[in-house]
Amino acid sequence: MENIIKGIRQYYPVSDSSLEVLFSYMKKMELPKKHLLIHGGVLDRHVYFIEKGFCRSYCLRDGEEITIWFSREGDITFAMKDLYHNQPGYEYVELLEDCEKYADPD
């Protein structure tokens, strides 16, 4: 979880013991390139921590994919409306590489 720790500590001075508690609740996921991690219109309240890989968040407008942002190793990714408003959002997250991620539990 080296990349995730670096990503977190880039913004927050978190102790090793706090990180251990956080990681004890997380589930490891190894997913292939082109996997759709988050589907628009489907509620997904997870926060995904990226240890390895690269992904893109996008929405559909008139059938066209509009890229919103990219996430890389050490970043987090999630569907904003789903997480903040507990409503299915419009965002999709596609893995652009094979990825190793950690997610909060169901």
Which positions does each model-derived feature cover?
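Cytosolic regulatory regions built on CNB/CRP/Popeye-like sensor folds
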Residues: 1-106
